[in-house]
Structures are given as structure tokens and as C-alpha cells.
């Protein structure tokens, strides 16, 4: 088994266990900072050793060195800045050398930081160097719109890991996972990173990698923060628990990684390799466009398809962990097998289903073949992404007579049925109600909204009924209500929400 990055597994929870009670007592009398969702992920991996050699949030010199050179000031390879960002108001209350209690949910004391640095980062430089500067990159948007403008650096002392209430048997620390590998005598382990559901091709890929390197398989999906719009981790874990059953006995283990991804492409791939090395893996599969967020609004890729593989390979001697390049696997129907594309003659018939096509089939309720994935996984994904006729929707009535039209639509929808609930939703003067709209849609409810919605409402299947040419359901101001209702029903039928 490989040594952790930097030579020592920095398990701060174990290190500080004897003084936990004293730290907890002290923390109750200290200034407090409530950790953000990203900071909770970061601090968990600092405290449990996943981010070894880090033992705290980066000070200014280490931060600038990582941003500019992908190295700590010690010279050790580290590609992603791990920082404690705070707002200016809080920063003004902090002094160098001060100790601050770090909390989860304003309630659970996680750690104490001794502040060694208070600094204002050059976010433009961070965006350019770490994420390549495209302002549409989700990490740059987070940096500019969400992250605090002041960073605090300092060493941490552990009180406890952030609290979790789900999948506790799968939340293995680096020390625990290394102990598992030692008990099972797994001295060669191929780690597989994913933030998506897994299908037959992924199983084939990982088994091939294991055979090729005489190793076992660690399925190590990310369950912290991933790309906006990704499938929720509860759905994905159901998929992972199902697919791990499909591996030969004793070859694969599933464990969860509480990582806040930055979607930083090649730099992130190096970071992922370091983390998996700390967790005890000896090999790491680096995928095509690994940790990339896809394309921007112009259709341009944020990263090249093989940038990650090239960068990780360039550091292979320092990393120690062996890189296993992801091979594109495809299905041969005539032989009922999966093979790497580079092993197939061009005349051989192959089949594949893209992510876009899979989402389309889920949305429309059409067949997803067994050669692509397992029926049990299809069922899990259909629960998350039901076909249109089971999905909720929102009709925004922007008209002179919104209540009359809304009542007519409600009566008609109730008559049609369709297996969903319907509701007239009036948020006028009650903006707090807007937060409920995404939940109604997710639950399959058909909402009829009688006031315009702000663009900040983040929900799928929102359609406007209006006199404007750009409206989804275009009507005229003088059109009879019965015709407006008919147009709306036809629109919903055309878009598969109703089946007659």
C-alpha cells in the first residue's frame, strides 16, 4: 500500500482525540463561524486525512504558491487551493492569532482554527490560473458570486467530523479504508471516481482495469458538492449499491467521498489522484474530460478531452499512484460483449446510448435496453426522472383575467386527471412561497400560477401563457376562455404531460 501524500496520514480527529473535551469546552466561549456547504466538505477531508498533508486552511503564501505553481511552499504537489472564505464584516472582527470555533448548522462544533493569516485574494488570478478564466465556469461563478472576499488561514484542531445521518457504513475515512484493505489483503487497488450513475460499460471498464493491473476495485463516488444539475447523491448511491452486487465476489468495494468538486479539469484530476492515494488506492482511473464541467454557452469545451490524463501522467513520479487512462467502451450486439473502441474493427456493428439519449428515454418513458444497464438501475433512475406524463409542471397565467383562466384550467385538469395533483398557486405579496415551487414540480404537481414568476425561481417545466409572441402558450387578449383552455391542454399533450 502506498504512503499518504507527504508521507504521513494527517488524521486530526485521531491526533486530537485526547483533548476533544477540552477543545469543545473552549469552543463554546470563542467567536464562531458557521461553515458553508463547501467548507464542511473541505474541513471533513482535512480532519480525516483525505487532504493530507494539509492540517488547516491555506495561509497566504501557500495559497499563492498553489494558485501559481500547483505546489505548497514546501514544494509538495497540491493543485487546488483549500481556503476558508469569510465576508468582510466577519473578517473585521478577527485578529491574527485568534482562535475561532467552526460550526456545522450553527449548532455542532467541528473544529477550532488558530488564525495565522487574514488576506484578500486576487480572485481574477485564482480564476485564471486554477480554472482557466472562463466566467461561465461554475467554480468561477461560485468564486465571484458566493465565496467571501476575505480568506482566513490557520491550523485546525479537531473536535469531531461533520455530522452525517445517512449511509454511515459507506462513509469510510482514509484510515478506515486503509484498514479494510489491509484486513482483506488488498495490496493493489484501482480507484474509480464518479459523480454520475454507473452502467454496464462502467462495470466492464473497472473490471478490465482490475484484471490488467492485478488489482481490486474501489468505487469511490463523490457525495459532496458536484456540478449544478447533477443527479442527487441519494439516487446515485442506490445505483452504486445495486451495481456493486454485479461484480465478482470479493473484487469490489463501495465507499463514499465527501468532496466538494470544483470541476477544475486537469488540476482537479491531479487532486483526485492525491486524495485516492491518501485513501489507500495504488491506481487511479482518469477519465476523458475528467472533472470537466462540459461546455459553455457558446458550445466551447472548458477543457480538452485528454488534458486531465496528460497532466496527471506528467506528475506520475511525484504522485506515486499509477494512472489508468479511461478507455471508451462500447457494446457489440452480435457478440453480446463490451470492448474498448480501440480494439474494434471499424466494420463491426456497435451500439451505444449517450447521456442525452438516456435522459430523453427516461423523460419519455421509452425502453432502455438491458445491454446498456440493469433493469434495477433503470427503475431507480425512473423514480428520480419519471416520464413527462408523471412530471409536475407550472403554467404561469400572465393575462388580464388570470383568476378566471386559472379556475377554468384547474377544472379541466382535474377532469383530465393524469395521476397528478393540481393546484392554483398565488404568491402575490408572499414571496417566501416561491421557494415551494421546485418542490411542487418535483412531487409531480401541476401548478397554475396567477402572478408572474421572477427569473430566480429554479424549477423545471415552467411555461408562460401570455399574449407575447415569445410565450409558450400564445393567446390573444380577446380570446374566449374555452379556447385558451383548449390551447393549454393541446400544448401539454404535445409536450407529453398528458396522454389521451
From Swiss-Prot:
InterPro entries: ATP-Sase_PUA-like_dom, P-loop_NTPase, PUA-like_sf, Rossmann-like_a/b/a_fold, Sulf_adenylyltr_euk, Sulf_AdTrans/APS_kinase, Sulfurylase_cat_dom, Sulphate_adenylyltransferase. Keywords: Amino-acid biosynthesis, ATP-binding, Cysteine biosynthesis, Cytoplasm, Methionine biosynthesis, Nucleotide-binding, Nucleotidyltransferase, Transferase. The record marks 199, 202 as: Transition state stabilizer. One of its GO terms (molecular function) is ATP binding. It catalyses: sulfate + ATP + H(+) = adenosine 5'-phosphosulfate + diphosphate. SUPFAM superfamilies: Nucleotidylyl transferase (SSF52374), P-loop containing nucleoside triphosphate hydrolases (SSF52540), PUA domain-like (SSF88697). Residues 391-500 are annotated as: Required for oligomerization. The oligomerization domain is distantly related to APS kinases, but it is not functional and does not bind APS. It is required for oligomerization of the enzyme, although the oligomerization state has no effect on the catalytic activity of the enzyme. This is Sulfate adenylyltransferase. It comes from Eremothecium gossypii (strain ATCC 10895 / CBS 109.51 / FGSC 9923 / NRRL Y-1056).
